[in-house]
Swiss-Prot record:
Its cofactor is Mg(2+). Residues 586-605 bind DNA. The lineage of its organism: Eukaryota, Metazoa, Chordata, Craniata, Vertebrata. It holds the Pfam family PIF1. Residues 633-650 have a biased composition (Acidic residues). The keyword Chaperone does not apply. This is ATP-dependent DNA helicase PIF1. Monomer. Interacts with telomerase. The gene is Pif1. Residues 171-199, 631-650 are annotated as: Disordered. It comes from Mus musculus.
Length: 650
């Protein structure tokens, strides 16, 4: 009897999902909502047609001209083709799945134009589609005067052939283009109504050659295929296996409408541009009786959020309590008036139960999500990522895997105690201490900042709603007020330039401040780069679907940070004191933040702090034994319910 759980290898062998993934990876096609506006020569809309589900394709006609084909939904929808020689792109909101293409009618100046307003695009698919369009435009040969006249007088070309994938030589030719980037607009402007065709060759933004390393491993690609099929799934893996990276890739591959990104903590939610699971659910802490939780969820704003949700992403699932998950499942069915598990919502769940457990009061034993009564009905597929990306040293990887499973041999103890002598800082950058308690973090950072000579430079955040600053404090990795001095130890809390090593968790020291403007800090990072750090923006979603934003420097003081807030980070140089470890998995989370054993210093190591919950060990052991958790511990009724909710293709 199958439990409905499978391994990444099985997922890789599924032909239907492989074919689906192939279709999804075509950068010349895009499926989204499209509003077609026919504009007058003055730029005013004369006619508008809204298509809820349309397909855009890049191709060429029989004259090898670049064309855009718009296919309306349904068998009766007639395709329309637009020449792209004079297209103008408006891409300011591409990161949210929206963009606009303005095309002069038939490429003839003065004949008005057609405007395609794209929305609800999977952001990553939209980015690749626009990138392909820019590249093909950049290397397309421009017609001379005679050939242009011949084309206008000749018959209208009818054939349409999808363009070929971008070739390396096309990237090189595009990168060699020296023209200014005048044809790519950041946002539509009412005054910009000229239909004059741009000069050839079209200018493009600076483009880099793609890396030969695939973006996703085979394991990660298997997870993505399952998600794109509409399958509810839980994917797990040890620290550093790329769970956060994959989750962001998944979110970029799904339509924004109907996709709700959540996490168990505010910081984790902010990393994926979402909200906390509690804020979305709208039932408070979930400790109230089920009837009261349902009443809270039926409030107009909360109820609409549940009704609109088609795909629910939950990150850091290890910190979600079983009873809360069961109540969410019951609320979803009741509010949506559907008997399907979780009210028919596709669940995309990520996390590692061998990391931080749910927070409980007193000595109460935490109940993990996989112990929830509804877990098996709601999560028919579990995939485990096994390839570690954060650490390259196989010895360190093996050590961490042993600690993850609660095993601390004499050799592991010897290696960790030996790190106490490591000199993990250099060039004025000292190791970040990971603390078990947030109070210790605040006291440590405040003490060391006061000890530095010189003036304090304060940087105050700009919040979209100052009255909700406390909400932003809880969900943003940056504080309302950041105080710095010359010599302050800092850490980046956002990726700025991955190729240059300026990534989330990169360590540095303040070496100066600009003399003009706001006096922005100059930071020398451990990777050797000195950079002026400028304001960045964080956006979080709160109860009722409202969005809040905070503008602040992407820095935090880094003499110390808490183990809880370090979850998901990769740190260059780390100092750890595990004397006050109070939860299973806490020591593993702390140790696994380090990129290498050489960048780790462990003080007063005691093997007894390495522990994990036996129930979690059993969960993962049974997962690896066959195709997933055994049904032997479930009663027949629950087992039958599980099988009813299995995908028949598995």
């Amino acid at each position: 009897m199958r439990s409905g759980l499978c391994t990444p290898a099985e997922a890789l062998e599924m032909p239907s999902s492989t074919e689906a993934a192939t279709d999804e990876c075509d950068d010349a096609e895009l499926r989204c909502r499209v509003a077609v506006e026919e504009l007058s020569p003055g730029g005013q809309p004369r006619k508008r047609q809204a298509l809820r589900a349309a397909e855009l394709s890049l191709g060429r006609n029989e004259r090898r001209e670049l064309m855009l084909r718009l296919q309306a939904p349904g068998p009766t929808g007639r395709p329309r083709c637009f020449p792209l020689r004079a297209v103008r792109l408006f891409t300011r909101f591409a990161a949210t799945g929206r963009s606009t293409l303005r095309l002069p009618t038939d490429g003839v100046p003065g004949a008005g134009s057609v405007q395609l307003l794209l929305s609800d695009c999977p952001p990553e698919r939209l980015r690749r589609f626009l990138r392909t369009l820019r590249l093909k435009l950049a290397v397309a040969p421009g017609p001379g005067p005679a050939s242009a006249r011949a084309q206008l007088l000749g018959p209208r070309p009818r054939d349409f052939v999808t363009i070929s994938p971008v070739q390396p030589e096309e990237l090189q030719r595009a990168a060699a283009t020296k023209a200014p980037d005048s044809a790519l607009e950041k946002r539509p402007m009412e005054s910009q109504t000229s239909t004059e065709a741009p000069r050839w060759p079209l200018p493009v933004k600076k483009l880099r050659m793609p890396s030969t390393k695939p973006k996703l491993s085979e394991e990660q690609a298997a997870v993505l295929r399952m998600v794109l099929k509409g399958q509810s799934i839980f994917f797990t893996g040890s620290a550093g296996t790329g769970k956060s990276y994959l989750l962001k890739h998944i979110l970029g591959s799904l339509p924004p409408t109907g996709t709700v990104a959540t996490a168990s903590t505010g910081v984790a939610a902010c990393h994926i541009g979402g909200t906390t699971l509690h804020a979305f659910a709208g039932i408070g802490s979930g400790q109230a009786p089920l009837a009261q939780c349902m009443a809270l969820a039926n409030r107009p704003g909360v109820r609409q959020g549940w009704l609109n949700c088609q795909r629910l992403v939950i990150d850091e699932i290890s910190m979600v309590e079983a009873d809360f998950f069961d109540k969410l499942e019951a609320v979803a069915r009741a509010v949506r008036q559907q008997k399907k598990p979780f009210g028919g919502i596709q669940l995309i769940i990520c996390g590692d139960f061998l990391q931080l457990p749910p927070v409980t009061k007193g000595s109460q034993q935490p109940q993990f999500c996989f112990q929830a009564k509804s877990w098996r009905r709601c999560v028919p597929v579990i995939l485990e990522l096994t390839e570690v990306w954060r650490q390259a040293d196989q010895t360190f990887i093996s050590l961490l895997q042993a600690v993850r499973l609660g095993r601390c041999s004499d050799e592991v103890t010897r290696q960790l105690r030996a790190t106490a002598a490591h000199k993990v800082g250099r060039d004025g950058i000292v190791a970040t201490r990971l603390c078990t308690h947030q109070d210790d973090v605040a006291l440590t950072n405040e003490k060391w900042l006061k000890a530095l000579p010189g003036d304090v430079h304060s940087f105050e955040a700009i919040d979209s709603d100052p009255e909700l600053s406390r909400t932003l404090d809880a969900q943003c990795p940056v504080s309302r007020v950041l105080q710095l001095k010359l010599g302050a130890q800092v850490m980046l809390v956002k990726n700025l330039a991955v190729s240059r090593g300026l990534v989330n968790g990169a360590r540095g020291v303040v070496v100066g401040f600009e003399s003009e403007g706001r006096g922005l800090p100059r930071v020398r990072f451990l990777c050797g780069i000195t950079e002026v750090i400028r304001t960045d923006r964080w956006t979080v979603q709160v109860t009722g679907g409202q969005y809040l934003s905070r503008q602040q420097l992407p820095l935090q003081l880094a003499w110390a940070i808490s183990i809880h807030k370090s979850q998901g980070m990769s740190l260059d140089c780390v100092e750890i004191s595990l004397g006050r470890v109070f939860a299973s998995g806490q020591a593993y989370v702390a140790l696994s933040r380090a990129r290498s054993l050489q960048g780790l210093r462990v003080l007063d190591f005691d093997p007894t702090v390495v522990r994990c919950d036996s129930r979690v060990l059993h969960f993962y052991a049974t997962l690896r034994q066959g195709r997933g958790l055994s049904l032997e511990s479930q009663d027949d009724e629950e087992a039958n319910s599980d099988l009813e909710n299995m995908d028949p293709n598995l």
